[in-house]
Regions:
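Short, contiguous alpha-helical
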Residues: 25, 33-36, 49-97, 136-178
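N-terminal targeting signals for Sec/Tat export/insertion, comprising classic cleavable signal peptides
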Residues: 14-49
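Hydrophobic residues within well-ordered, non-membrane alpha-helices that form the packing/core
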Residues: 39, 122-123, 162
Length: 178
């Protein structure tokens, strides 16, 4: 577990009142460390990989026609970061919709990394005064802090799927290799 947590900064002393932006940013940084690491670990020629019936036993019948490719997992997280942190009012530095059309590893990783830069900028606008003030809800969450925490959780959901894709291709995820 320690190797998977190595993306976090050191914890403050017990009893210290922590700045909400710093606390949430640490959570997002850990998600970023894992997701970007997985995205970089998958070889470029495997970015079009998606699980299909042929890799499972005949008795394990499932519909795979809507399963995302690896590149779609990466670009989905990138687009979601822009969506979740749009409350900040910070204008994205790219066409967010176009991210969904990316098909190459280099472009997907660049978009993913840029989306985390955007997310960190948004989190930096969270203050003790506005952290838990209700704003326009996103997926049922209505404060800057809860939306930011949900964004990190969402990234972890897709990280778990990306790990499965890596393992199906014989690749040990970077966090597990340490």
């Amino acid at each position: 577990m320690h190797s998977q947590m190595s993306g976090l900064p050191p914890s403050p002393p017990v009893g210290t009142k922590e700045d909400p932006a710093k606390a949430v940013d640490g959570l997002l940084s850990l998600t970023e460390f894992q997701v970007v690491g997985a995205a970089k670990a998958m070889p470029a020629d495997k970015y079009s990989f998606a699980p299909a019936q042929g890799i499972f036993a005949a008795s394990q019948t499932t519909q795979f026609d809507t399963v995302r490719t690896f590149v779609a997992q990466v670009t989905h997280v990138a687009q979601a970061n822009y969506f979740f942190f749009g409350w900040s009012g910070i204008q994205p530095d790219r066409d967010v919709k176009a991210i969904g059309s990316i098909t190459t590893k280099d472009e997907a990783v660049a978009a993913l990394e840029a989306s985390f830069v955007y997310a960190h900028k948004a989190i930096a606008t969270i203050t003790p005064e506005n952290a838990f003030v209700a704003i326009k809800p996103i997926d049922g969450f209505s404060t800057r802090t809860t939306i930011a925490a949900f964004a990190a959780a969402h990234g972890y959901d897709h990280y778990g799927q990306m790990v499965e894709y890596l393992r199906m291709n014989g690749i040990v995820p970077p966090a597990s290799a340490k």
